[in-house]
UniProtKB/Swiss-Prot annotation:
GO molecular function: 2 iron, 2 sulfur cluster binding; metal ion binding
Keyword RNA-binding: no
InterPro entries for this protein: GlrX-like_pln_2, Glutaredoxin, Glutaredoxin_subgr, Thioredoxin-like_sf
Similarity-based family: Belongs to the glutaredoxin family. CC-type subfamily.
Role played: May only reduce GSH-thiol disulfides, but not protein disulfides.
Originating species: Arabidopsis thaliana (Mouse-ear cress)
PANTHER family cross-referenced by the UniProt entry: GLUTAREDOXIN
PROSITE patterns: GLUTAREDOXIN_2 (PS51354)
Protein name: Monothiol glutaredoxin-S4
Protein origin, superkingdom: Eukaryota
Localization terms from the record: Cytoplasm; Nucleus
Domain spans labelled Glutaredoxin: 1-101
Keyword Iron-sulfur: yes
Length: 102
């Protein structure tokens, strides 16, 4: 989907989320606590959110929220993000794309 690709490529960190999802809240909080200013798309609030969710599923995202893209690349969901954080790979990745300055 062209719209999805445009959304992903416009910012260094993009999170697809739903307000009703506790794991989405956790992932958003993690990035914000790092000092990152992610672009967040709440799929339960935006136009064509269901369509975007289906496009994420076609990319292999399961569950479809939260889904994180860093530097235009699919990182994955909460499990993948937390694994990167715990093995200390997340911060260097954020620095490489200019999302984190420290």
């Amino acid at each position: 989907m062209d719209k999805l690709q445009k959304m992903i490529s416009e910012k260094s960190v993009v999170i697809f989320s739903k307000n009703s999802c506790c794991m989405s809240h956790t992932i958003k909080t993690l990035f914000i606590d790092f000092g990152v200013n992610p672009t967040i798309y709440e799929l339960d609030e935006i136009n064509r959110g269901k369509e975007i969710e289906q496009a994420l599923a076609q990319l292999g995202c399961s569950p479809t929220v939260p889904v994180v893209f860093i530097g235009g690349q699919l990182v994955g969901g909460a499990n993948q993000v937390m694994s990167l954080h715990l093995n200390r790979s997340l911060v260097p990745m954020l620095k490489r794309v200019g999302a984190l300055w420290l």
